[in-house]
Amino acid sequence: MGCMAKYRVQNPKTNEIEKTYENITSDELEQALSTADETFKQWREKSYEERAEVLRKVAQLFDDKRDELARIIANEMGKAVDQGDGEVDDVVEIFNYYADNGAKFGADEEIPNERGGTSIMRKIPLGVIVGVMPWNFPYYQVARFAAPALMAGNVVMVKHANICPQSAEAIEKIFDEAGAPKGLYTNIFAGHSQISKLINDDRVQGVSLTGSEGAGRSIASQAGQALKKCVLELGGTDAYIVLDSTDIPAAAKTAWDKRIGNTGQACTSNKRMIVMEDIYDEFVDELVKIASSYTEGDPLNPEEGKFYPMSSRDAAENLVQQLKIAVEEGAKIHVGGEVTGKGAYFTPAVITD
């Protein structure tokens, strides 16, 4: 029996349901994996230039469809379209980069050894690689995973995050339109048990995950038990350090801009700010001034001084709970920290300990 869990696309601006998707069935998963495995046997024999041709077509289609792609993620996870457009820029660059450099990266390397001989390092394709992708950069993260894997002669099966199925679907359609062989890039709507099944299947040779520490531990454990190659990119706790020699208004604006991008939902965003004591109060005042000036914005019509919805209403309400715990532990909220309206808008907050 197949798992019939459903994914609902909820517009974070309005919280309205726009579309519903269902998980792939067990039979469909087997068919997808079988097709990917057969495609790998042909794709691995392609020259680097033949592989590069497909990647360049994918890059061009991303470029051609940038407005549509940016609107999809604006409606799906609240990202402002100008930021979505910037994400597409990165995707185009990544696919073209690996198309241009894949042959160099994949070339045999001759390495002199200490006995006067020569060792040869030969790079060969692995096979079917499974990618478990996050929602916060739904195109960029897929490109970082898929482009080098495909250029190296592998095929990929991508399980995207539950809240961005339209983005996932759009990527697969681009590969189809680029003339990629069926099974080269496969999008799957799948549950945890189905991903476990893939990891433990002999036809799958590797898995890559970008996500939480908990998910990483689970994937790494399963991959280790199955002796599969595993790549993990997990979260960070980046600090923004402010010295007393700084221009305080400029430093506060930079810190704010780095924190507010993608509504703060990025692993590279500064999670905390460490400020030298003699400028601490002035720096906090500057941040509060900036935060207080921001008002709700429409992700489809971005403007300076606007903040946009979180990825979902649940995500916004989770932040409220985090702030509640912080206050209980002694933190002070200077401004913001509330969910407003029907959607997933969370007023920008400044808290200190």
Protein language model features and the residues they cover:
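N-terminal Rossmann-like NAD(P)+-binding subdomain of aldehyde/semialdehyde dehydrogenases
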Residues: 1-117, 293
